[in-house]
C-alpha cells in the first residue's frame, strides 16, 4: 500500500491526461462519492416517513472523519485535502455574497432545528429587493476574494455555497422556518467541504426545486436561473454541447410583453394538454395512497389538493455534477415526501413529459375557406389515418416532416417520420448534413412509434368534450412518428434527462414529447367551460392510478383536436460531454473574472452585478 501523502509534499505528475479534460484544481469535484469515501453502511430507517435525513447520509462532526461501520478501517482523506495545505484553507462554512463568513451551522449559537413538517412551498412568489440582488454572479465574485487561484473554486462547491447563502438570507427575512439554513447545510456536507465531491447536492437543490414549482410566477425561480445554463441557452455544435462564454449573465431578464402570440398560446394551453394527459393517458403517482405507512408521503400532490393542471409540476432543478445546468420540467410523474422533495422509489422508472402546443394549427372555424378548417371537418367525419395526415399537411409548414430512409432530417420540425404513407414530395429529395452524434440519435429513435388521441367536436348541449374512436375502432392510434434529435425540443429533453440522471442515477428515465393540437372556438363555443368525459373504451390513467374524476377545458383555452405522445430515446454518453464542457466553461469564466480584478480592491469586485431579474416564462 502506498504511503499516505504528507502535507506540503509534492505530488507526482499525472500520467498522460486527456487534453479535453478540465485543468487540475486543488479541490476536484468530478469524482464519484463512492470513489472518495468507499462504501457506506445503510442508514437507519427514519422514525417518520419521508424524514429529511432519509434522503442523504448525515454529516460527520466537524474535524472528525466520516466513520463507517464499527471495525471498519479509517478511510484516507481525499487527495484534495493534502493538496490544499499549501494555500489558504477553503472556508468550511457558507460565505456571504461579499466573501465574508456566514454563520457556522455547527458551532455558532442559533435557532433549533426547524419544525419537522417544514415545507419548501411556504416561500412566497415575490421576494424583497435585497434578496433579488443576491445573484450567483455576485456570490461567485465574492468567493474569489479569499483564494489565491481561481482553480481553488470548483463549480459544484460554488453553486452549493450560493444556495446555502441564499437560504440563510431567506431565513433572515422570515420567509422560511428558523434553523432551516443550518439544517440543509448539515445534510449537504458529508465531510469537510474543502473537497467539493464530499458534499451531497440533493438537500439544497431539491429544496429549491420544490420551492419553485410555480416557475414563471415565482421570483425565486427567475433568480436561480440567472447564471444557470438551460436548454434555451445551451448550443450544440459538431462536437456536442457548447456553453456560451456569457453563461454567467444568461436569463437576466424574462419579459412577458416580449413574447410572441405562439408563446402565449402555449402558456394558455399547456394546462389543457396536462389535463388531457392525466385524464386519459398517464397515471398519477400521488393518487391512491390509503395505507398508514404512506399517509404522510404526498403532502404536496394529494388528489384534489392542487388544480389538475399543476399536478406533478416541477421547479428548477440543477444538475448534481457541477451545478452549472438547470431544467424546469413540465411534468415529472414522481411522488414527493412531506417536505415537497422529489422522492422516487429506488430503481423505479421516472416518466417525464415536455409539452408543446402548436399554435400554427389553431385555425379559426369561422373561416371556412382556410385549408386547415376544411381538413378538420373531413377528419371529424372520417376519423381515418389518411384524414389525419391530410390535416397535418394542410398548413404550409406541416408539424410532421418526412425524410427519406438513409438520410437525416433538417432541424425545422420537432416530429419526423420515414414512413412512406407520410411521403411528401416537398421533402422527399432533400439531402441534409448532420453531425455524427445527431445521426446516431436519429437512428436510435427511428423505430419509435407515437400514440395519437383524437378528440371529437364539443357537445354544446351537455358541455362536454371526449375522445373519439378512429375508423379502425381503436381509441389510440399508433403512428410511426418520432422526435427529431436535431430540433431544440429534443435537445431540451436531453438536458432535462441529464439533470434528472445526476440525482436519480438508479431510476431509468422515460422521456416523452407531448404535442397538443387545438383550434380556436366557434361562436357558439365562446365562454363555455367543457367537461372532459370518457369516450368509448377510453383509457383512464394508463400505467398508474386512474385519472382525475373531474377535468375541464376553460373558456380561454383551445378546443382540443389531437394529442400526440412520443417516447424519446437518449444516448447517456452525451451526458459526459455536458458534464465535461460545463466544467471547462466554469473554469474559463473564473479565469476571466480573476484577470479582470481591480488591483486596488482585492481578488474581485463583489458589488459588480447585473440588475435583479423580473419574473416571466421562457423556454426551459
From Swiss-Prot:
InterPro entries per the UniProt record, alphabetical: Herpes_alk_exo, Restrct_endonuc-II-like, Viral_alk_exo
Region listing for Disordered, in residue ranges: 1-122, 595-620
Compositional bias of kind Pro residues: 40-49
A GO molecular-function descriptor: endonuclease activity
Primary location recorded for the protein, binned into one broad class: host cell
The enzyme's E.C. designation: 3.1.-.-
Compositional bias annotation for Low complexity: 1-10, 603-620
Localization per Swiss-Prot or TrEMBL: Host nucleus; Host cytoplasm
Compositionally biased residues, Basic and acidic residues: 11-23
CC terms in the record's Gene Ontology section: host cell cytoplasm; host cell nucleus
Entry keyword annotation includes RNA-binding: no
Annotated keywords: Endonuclease, Exonuclease, Host cytoplasm, Host nucleus, Host-virus interaction, Hydrolase, Nuclease
Swiss-Prot/TrEMBL site (Required for function) positions: 270, 330, 354, 356
Family classification: Belongs to the herpesviridae alkaline nuclease family.
Subunit field text: Interacts with major DNA-binding protein; this interaction increases the nuclease processivity of the alkaline exonuclease.
Protein name: Alkaline nuclease
Organism: Human herpesvirus 2
Amino acid at each position: 500500500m502506498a504511503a499516505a501523502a504528507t502535507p506540503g509534499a509534492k505530488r507526482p505528475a499525472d500520467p498522460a491526461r486527456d487534453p479535453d479534460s478540465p485543468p487540475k484544481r486543488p479541490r476536484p469535484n468530478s469524482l464519484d462519492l463512492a470513489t472518495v469515501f468507499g462504501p457506506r453502511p445503510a442508514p437507519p430507517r427514519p422514525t417518520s416517513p419521508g424524514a429529511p435525513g432519509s434522503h442523504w447520509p448525515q454529516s460527520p462532526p466537524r474535524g472528525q472523519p466520516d466513520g463507517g461501520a464499527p471495525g471498519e478501517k479509517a478511510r484516507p482523506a481525499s487527495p484534495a485535502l493534502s493538496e490544499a495545505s499549501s494555500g489558504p484553507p477553503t472556508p468550511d462554512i457558507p460565505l456571504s455574497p461579499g466573501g465574508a463568513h456566514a454563520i457556522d451551522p455547527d458551532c455558532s449559537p442559533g435557532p433549533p432545528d426547524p419544525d419537522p413538517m417544514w415545507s419548501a412551498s411556504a416561500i412566497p412568489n415575490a421576494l424583497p429587493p435585497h434578496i433579488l440582488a443576491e445573484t450567483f454572479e455576485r456570490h461567485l465574485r465574492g468567493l474569489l476574494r479569499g483564494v489565491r487561484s481561481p482553480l481553488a473554486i470548483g463549480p459544484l462547491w460554488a453553486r452549493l455555497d450560493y444556495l446555502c447563502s441564499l437560504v440563510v438570507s431567506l431565513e433572515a427575512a422570515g420567509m422560511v422556518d428558523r434553523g432551516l439554513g443550518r439544517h440543509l447545510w448539515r445534510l449537504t456536507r458529508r465531510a469537510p467541504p474543502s473537497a467539493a465531491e464530499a458534499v451531497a447536492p440533493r438537500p439544497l437543490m431539491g429544496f429549491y426545486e420544490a420551492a419553485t414549482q410555480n416557475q414563471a410566477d415565482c421570483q425565486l425561480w427567475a433568480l436561480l436561473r440567472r447564471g444557470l445554463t438551460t436548454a434555451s441557452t445551451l448550443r450544440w455544435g459538431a462536437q456536442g454541447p457548447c456553453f456560451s462564454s456569457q453563461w454567467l449573465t444568461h436569463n437576466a431578464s424574462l419579459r412577458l410583453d416580449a413574447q410572441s402570440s405562439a408563446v402565449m398560446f402555449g402558456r394558455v394551453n399547456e394546462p389543457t394538454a396536462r389535463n388531457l394527459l392525466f385524464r386519459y393517458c398517464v397515471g398519477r403517482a400521488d393518487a391512491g395512497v390509503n395505507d398508514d405507512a404512506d399517509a404522510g408521503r404526498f403532502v404536496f400532490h394529494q388528489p384534489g389538493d392542487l388544480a389538475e393542471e399543476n399536478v406533478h409540476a416541477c421547479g428548477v432543478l440543477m444538475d448534481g455534477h457541477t451545478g452549472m445546468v438547470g431544467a424546469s420540467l413540465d411534468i415529472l410523474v414522481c411522488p414527493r415526501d412531506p417536505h415537497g422533495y422529489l422522492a422516487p422509489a429506488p430503481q423505479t422508472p421516472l416518466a417525464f413529459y415536455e409539452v408543446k402546443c402548436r399554435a400554427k394549427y389553431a385555425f379559426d372555424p369561422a373561416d371556412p375557406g382556410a385549408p386547415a378548417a376544411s381538413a378538420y371537418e373531413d377528419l371529424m367525419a372520417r376519423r381515418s389515418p389518411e384524414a389525419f395526415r391530410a390535416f397535418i399537411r394542410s398548413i404550409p409548414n406541416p408539424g410532421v416532416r418526412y425524410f427519406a430512409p438513409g438520410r437525416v432530417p433538417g432541424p425545422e420540425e420537432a416530429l419526423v417520420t420515414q414512413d412512406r404513407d407520410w411521403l411528401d414530395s416537398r421533402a422527399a429529395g432533400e439531402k441534409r448534413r448532420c453531425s455524427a452524434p445527431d445521426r446516431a440519435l436519429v437512428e436510435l429513435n427511428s423505430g419509435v412509434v407515437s400514440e395519437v388521441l383524437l378528440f371529437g367536436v364539443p357537445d354544446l348541449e351537455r358541455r362536454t368534450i371526449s375522445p373519439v374512436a378512429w375508423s379502425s375502432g381503436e381509441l389510440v392510434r399508433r403512428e410511426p412518428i418520432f422526435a427529431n434529435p436535431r430540433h431544440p425540443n429534443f435537445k431540451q429533453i436531453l438536458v432535462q434527462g441529464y439533470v434528472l440522471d445526476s440525482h436519480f442515477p438508479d431510476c431509468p428515465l422515460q422521456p416523452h414529447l407531448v404535442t397538443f393540437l387545438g383550434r380556436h372556438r366557434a361562436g357558439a363555443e365562446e365562454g363555455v367551460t367543457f367537461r372532459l368525459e370518457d369516450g368509448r373504451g377510453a383509457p383512464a390513467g394508463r400505467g398508474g392510478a386512474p385519472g382525475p374524476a373531474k377535468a375541464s377545458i376553460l373558456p380561454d383555452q383551445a378546443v382540443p383536436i389531437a394529442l400526440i405522445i412520443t417516447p424519446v430515446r437518449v444516448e447517456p454518453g452525451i451526458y459526459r460531454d455536458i458534464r465535461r464542457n460545463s466544467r471547462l466553461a466554469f473554469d474559463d469564466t473564473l479565469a476571466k473574472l480573476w484577470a479582470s480584478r481591480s488591483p486596488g480592491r482585492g481578488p474581485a469586485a463583489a458589488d459588480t452585478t447585473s440588475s435583479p431579474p423580473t419574473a416571466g416564462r421562457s423556454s426551459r
